[in-house]
Each structure stands twice: as structure tokens, then as C-alpha cells.
Amino acid sequence: MRVPVFENYVKIVQHPSAKMEFGSGAVMICSYGDYTDVLLFRELKLQEKISIDTAGRMTDNAGKYQGLKVNEAREKIIQDLQEMNLVERVENIKHRTPCCERSKNPVEIIPMEEYYVKQIEHKNELLDIARSLKFHPEEHRRRLIDWIEAISIDWPISRRRYNATEVPVWYCKSCNEANLPEPGKYVRPWKEKPPFDSCKKCGEKDFVGDERTFDTWMDSSISPLFITKYNRDQEFFEKTYPTSLRPQSKDIIRTWLHYTVLRCNQLTKKPPFTHAWIMGYGVDERGEKMSKSKGNAIDPIPILEKNGADMFRLWAASEVNLGSDFRVSEVKITGVGKFLSKLWNTARFVSNFPVVEEEPLETDKWILDELSKVIKESLEGYQDYNFFIPANRVREFIWNIFAPHYIELVKQRAYGIEFDEKSTRAAWSTLHICMKNLLLLLAPITPFITDKIWRELYSQESIHKQIFPEVKDDYQLSTITANIIEFNSLVWNKKKEQGLSLKNGISIEIPKNLELFESDLRAMHKLQR
């Protein structure tokens, strides 16, 4: 078949990628129109024609269109076809086109010689590692496996950019042999003389340095090797490699995570780490991913200066479950400050009483049961690197149970009002047990306020030198929590309905299932017999 304008003859061949039910049933391909064209050209072993140069202009293969920009050439070709009466109609259609992230211009494919790292032949090894890593959360394992399974080319690692790690190669001007320096020293071949005198192949002495740079992931992909002193301190490396954890965002699973696994496995024959901790995106109020190019990113520095790191950290930990996108809102970040104020005021109340040891009463056993549940669930969250669980579990416990119910229940007893010394000491002991454990659970998330309270109440040694609490004995009383909350709410509402202050007495019968807590309930609510 003869192609108009250029008058070239092209073969028509059968291929399964052409769909008879779609359009004319024929598919036109060119050397480098898109990725599908490239694959078909390689498969069919066709002779390429390079029509666009590195400046984005048409080459001599474009005939009379040589020198025009790509869009200019397209417009001129349409015009010429119309003049030849070969155009049936012109219409605008929408289709998927890869565009540059920064300039938003369509991407044109140009063949160039580059360096590659082999990855196709390593796919089975990479899949084995992807299946063996412990993902947090598990759902993101699929992203890595899907990416590895979809790999169809090796990894191009050289780039024609200015700011990146230089490719450390000098080429012999005589035979074009690539000559490398000894490892260990950073070199800039495009501006420095080679650290050798002659070509290793032909012995000539004239060289030209490579002007290209590496893909940024070439550096990042060996970060586990750098921190474990690979090839610099063998004893240290053997003790620390593989590392424990790779924390990162989900959008760079196919780059940073994949290339790290690829290169570290190639160099060491081992996975680079045991755990992959994958977080979501920070998104704006409309749910769009934050980025500099979109102009919707929020500078965290003013927020940190205004609210402090603890508030920011607690918001980040408690906003969404691990792996999910999180909506960035200064209102929500500031709102976390209410809880930190609650924590501070609770600690201030507890600080009124000495640290003692005493056997707990029933009310104390109940809150210690609830505390044990918080400790257990929080430690499970930490074990899974999911800070959302301890952040919210501790927050809910202090806000909804410990402060409004337990502290109010034992306040009279803690002050020694109409209670014996042993009962009062039991309240003191339990208050401090709860406070200590809650501070320890929160310390990794809010390191500053917890350390401040800890040093004020318990020890001049930092809280960050302590160990996590252990789950205590189960008194089998946490099942009564809903009943306590329900009864307290009932009394508060009754007083409100009757126009009474919370300090006023009221006559309400205590349910049988709460009789174990009668003394504290009567003291709390001023219940009349």
C-alpha cells in the first residue's frame, strides 16, 4: 500500500493487535509513535525511521517538513492532505497520551543509546522476594508484584540531565572503549581529566568524558547498603544487613521499593530489608494529591512553629489507618491540641497525689482491666508498625473513659473525703499506674509532652529510655464498662433535667450489676439513700 504525501510503500500484515470490529479494522503504526508501536516494530523486525530529533524538530526523514516542530508538521501535513482531497473529515477526539509531569507537553519517543541494568532475567527472584517481605499494610504487596510481573524491558539508568550523579565513564577517542576509574572516589568525567593515562583496550591517551547522569533511583536504590557500610566496614555490614524496615509512600513502590530490591539483591544475593512500611498520600481538601507542580502543597514549617511537633505528629498518626491517603487540614491539626491539653490537665490532676503501691478496689480493677485492653491493642499496633491504632486507642481511652468516668469516680476517694486511708492509697496507686502506662504508649508519637510529664512526675531519666508496658492480669471487669457509662450519663441527665448542679445530691437507685462500685458512685454523684 502506498502512503500519501511521502509516497512510501508499506506492507499490510496480519496481527492479533488489530481488532476487526474496531474502526476500519486496520492499524497504522510508525517507528516510535507510542509504546505499542515500539513493541510491534521489534516483534516484526521492521526497519525504523527516526523522524524527530532531540530538539523536537522533524529530521530529513520528514522530507519537506524537516526543521518544523512536531505540532507544526502535523498541521502542515493535514493542510497538504486537504489540498490533495484525501481528507474525509477533521474532528477532535480524546485519547490517552503520555505527557511530561512538569511541562504538560506530550511525550515523543526518540531512540538513544543508554545504559541499562538487567531486570527481566531477575523477575523470578524479585517475585520471590516480593512474596517474602512483610508488608504493612498487606494490601500494598500486590502493587509490587503487579509491577514486577508487568516488566517487559530492562531498566534504563542513564539520563541527559544536568543535576544528578554523573556517569563515571571516559571513552577512548580512538576505539570508543568505555574506561572506568577505580571505585571509591566521586568523579565528574564531563569536566575532569581521567585518573588513568591510557585506554585499557588500545593504549591511546585521548579521552572524552561521559556527559550523562544517572537516574535518581540509582543512588536511592542502594540506601540500605550505604547505611550498613557496604564495602566500607565488612564487620558492621554483616551485623546490620539486611536492615529491618523500609518506610515509604505507596506512589514509589514501582521505583524506590522495586529498584532497591533489584539492586541490593543483585549485589548481595539477599533482600535489603524484612519489612516494607507503606503510607498513603497527603491530599488537599478536594482529595487531590499534594504536589509542588499543582500548587496545592502546604508548607509544614509554619504549622510546626505555630502548633508544635507533638500536635502535628499525633494528627499524622491518628488521621487515617496505615496505607490510606490522608486529608491535610490545618483545622484538624489544630484540633488535636484539645487532646494534648486534656492529657496535660489529666497529668496535672494525678500529680496532686503521691506515687504509692496499694491493692486496688473494684473500681480500680475495672479501669486497670480497660487499661490492659488499651495496652494490648496498642502494642499490637506498634508491632505491625501501625501507629494509627495506639494513637486512637489511647486517645479514646483518656477522652471517653479514664478522664470523664474513672477520675470522676475516684476523685472523692483520692482526696480522702469519707474514705479510709487504704482506699485512698488504692486510688493514688491506680491513677499513677494508668498515667505511667498511657505516657509510655504515647511516647513514640508525642515524644515531647510525654517526656516533660514523665520527668515531672516519675523520673529525671527520659521516658524514651524506658520500655513499653506489659499487659496486666485480667480482672474480668471490662464487660461492665458500658453499664458504668450508661449509669453516669443517666445521673448527669437527670440532674440537668431537674436543674441541679453536678455537686447537688439526687436520689437514684444503683443497679445491681454496679453494686461493687457503690461507694465510689455515691461519692461521685452525691447519691442519696
Set out the residue ranges of the language-model regions.
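Active-site-adjacent "gating/activation" loops or surface patches in catalytic cores
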Residues: 5-13, 211-241, 400, 404-407
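Residue patterns forming the tRNA-binding/recognition surfaces of aminoacyl-tRNA synthetases
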Residues: 8, 17, 22-175, 204, ...
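Short active-site loop/helix that positions an aromatic residue
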Residues: 37-46, 225, 229-230, 261
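Short, conserved secondary-structure transition motifs
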Residues: 98-103, 250, 280-284
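Feature 926 captures the class I aminoacyl-tRNA synthetase adenylation module centered on the KMSKS loop
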Residues: 143, 150-218, 222, 266-309, ...
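A short glycine/serine-rich beta->alpha loop
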Residues: 240-251
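Short Ser/Thr-interspersed hydrophobic loop/turn segments at strand-loop and sheet-helix junctions
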Residues: 258-266
